[in-house]
Structure formats: structure tokens, C-alpha cells
């Protein structure tokens, strides 16, 4: 592939940039340790909007550093593969890995939602059985429904954070350190960016992709932190689709990653057949 201006003239470059932006936004919405711990931390320390922005930017910085290291390392290693006969096979192998990642993400999200629905149904059944004598309605807050979907390991981290920091005075340095450590968790989206950058063989376009991913991820994480500072529960009450959107975001991410894999697989297969 050529440089970024050439790709734009050929009409190919547009596919990668919007995909990276959308992937960063969707990844930021996916259930994950950093987002949950950030929200729990801000709520526990009764943080301000400024502190929420600091926390979100710190988490984004460390998370982005991991993506940059992976992407730059991939582009550096790709210099060893210059033969035209090898490149189509690399594209095909990368496509298989990307499609496998997309299928794993989709299956994991579906399984988690099914477990949540089964547990919620069991809770409702027990609740009706134990309180069938009570003629007064018992309403569960929207926040409880949203929290019920979170991974058990994720909830344990959030609860531990709230116990440790509840009511304590926290310095800006501690907030930055917490954000930096919270963003070091790798993600399937970073693997996708790595494989795409290997195939692009163009630093400008690869760097633009990673930058687009990073900026959209930063916007999402900062929004999550600010939302926690002004109360996530209030946001959920004002918009009933908030928890549904967060719950379904991994589906869109897996579909987007799958489309990227199909695109690369077609190009690799075409190159091999030629």
C-alpha cells in the first residue's frame, strides 16, 4: 500500500480512519476494569469534574501508550516482510486472527448477557415468591439493573475501591497514578490496530489510525469519569437507553472488527490467487 495521500486519492484510506475512531469509542463503552474502577473511584472520593477529567486523561495516556508500543513494534517488524509473495499470506493470517478475535468478543458478550438475564430472571422469581403477600410494588432503581450486568470480578474491584477510598482525601498525584495503572489493561482492539498497521506498511496512515483510536478513547473515558462525578445514576434515569447502549457496545465492536478482518482477508486471498 502507498502513503496516506495516495490511499486517499484511491479511495482506500477513508475505510481505516473512521473505523479506528468508531473502534475507540466502542472500546471505551465496553465493560472493563478501567471504566468501572474509574467510576467507583470518583464516586468514592466524591471527586469533582476536574478530577474526573484528570483520571480519564491519565487512564487514556497509559492505555494509548500500550497501543502505540504494539502498533510501532508491529510496523517495525513488518520491515522484515518486503517480498510481494509473502504479504498476501500475512494479510490472510492477520484476517484469520482478527476474525477469531471478533468471534471471541461476540461470544463472550453474548454469554455474559445470557448469564445476566438468567440471574435477573432467577432474582425476579425469588423476589415474587418471597414477597407474594406484599401488595405494594417494590421498584428496583435503574442503577441496580446496570450494575447487575457488570462482571463479578469487575464488581469486586469496584467494591474494594469504594471501601478503601470512601470519604478519604486524595491528592492529584494519587488520582493520576490510579488512572495510569488503570489504563494498562490490554484489549482486543489494540491487537486489531497492531495487525492493521502491519498490513498498511505506512507510518503516516498507521500513526493516524492509532491517534484516531486514542482520541476517541480519551473522549469516551473522560465522559465516563465526568458522568461518574455528576452521578451515573442520574444519567441512567434521564435516558433509559444508557445501560442498554453500554451493554450492547461490545456487539458493535466485534462486528466492526469482523468487517476489518473480512476486508483484509479478501485482499490477502486475491493476492494469493494472483
UniProtKB/Swiss-Prot annotation:
Q: Which GO terms describe its cellular component?
A: plasma membrane
Enumerate the Cytoplasmic topological stretches: 34-51, 107-174, 231-251
Q: What induces it?
A: By nickel and cobalt. Transcriptionally repressed by RcnR.
Q: Which domain of life is it from?
A: Bacteria
Chain ranges sitting on the Periplasmic side read 1-12, 73-85, 196-209, 273-274
Q: Name one GO molecular function term.
A: monoatomic cation efflux transmembrane transporter activity
For membrane topology, the record states: Multi-pass membrane protein
- Keywords for this entry? Cell inner membrane, Cell membrane, Cobalt, Cobalt transport, Ion transport, Membrane, Nickel, Nickel transport, Transmembrane, Transmembrane helix, Transport
The compartments listed are: Cell inner membrane
Q: What does this protein do?
A: Efflux system for nickel and cobalt.
Put simply, this protein is called Nickel/cobalt efflux system RcnA
Task: Say which species the protein is native to.
Answer: Salmonella paratyphi A (strain ATCC 9150 / SARB42)
Amino acid at each position: 500500500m502507498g502513503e496516506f495521500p495516495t490511499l486517499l486519492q484511491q479511495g482506500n484510506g477513508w475505510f481505516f480512519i473512521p473505523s479506528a475512531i468508531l473502534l475507540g469509542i466502542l472500546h471505551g463503552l465496553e465493560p472493563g476494569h478501567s471504566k468501572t474502577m474509574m467510576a467507583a473511584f470518583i464516586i468514592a472520593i466524591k471527586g469533582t469534574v476536574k478530577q474526573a477529567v484528570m483520571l480519564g486523561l491519565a487512564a487514556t495516556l497509559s492505555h494509548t501508550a500500550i497501543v502505540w508500543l504494539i502498533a510501532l513494534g508491529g510496523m517495525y517488524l513488518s520491515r522484515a516482510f518486503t517480498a510481494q509473495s509473502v504479504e498476501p499470506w500475512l494479510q490472510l493470517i492477520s484476517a484469520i486472527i482478527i476474525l477469531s478475535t471478533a468471534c471471541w468478543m461476540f461470544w463472550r458478550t453474548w454469554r455474559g448477557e445470557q448469564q445476566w438475564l438468567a440471574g435477573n430472571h432467577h432474582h425476579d422469581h425469588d423476589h415474587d415468591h418471597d414477597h407474594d403477600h406484599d401488595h405494594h410494588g417494590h421498584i428496583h432503581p435503574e442503577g441496580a439493573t446496570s450494575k447487575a450486568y457488570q462482571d463479578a470480578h469487575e464488581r469486586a474491584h469496584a467494591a474494594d475501591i469504594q471501601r478503601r477510598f470512601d470519604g478519604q482525601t486524595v491528592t492529584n498525584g494519587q488520582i493520576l497514578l490510579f488512572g495510569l495503572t488503570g489504563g494498562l489493561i490490554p484489549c482486543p482492539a489494540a491487537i486489531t490496530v497492531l495487525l492493521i498497521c502491519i498490513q498498511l506498511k505506512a507510518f503516516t496512515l498507521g500513526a493516524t489510525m492509532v491517534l484516531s483510536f486514542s482520541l476517541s478513547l480519551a473522549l469516551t473515558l473522560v465522559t465516563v469519569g465526568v458522568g461518574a462525578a455528576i452521578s451515573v445514576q442520574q444519567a441512567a434515569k434521564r435516558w433509559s437507553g444508557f445501560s442498554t447502549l453500554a451493554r450492547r457496545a461490545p456487539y458493535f465492536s466485534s462486528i466492526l472488527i469482523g468487517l476489518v478482518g473480512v476486508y483484509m482477508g479478501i485482499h490477502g486471498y486475491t493476492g494469493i490467487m494472483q
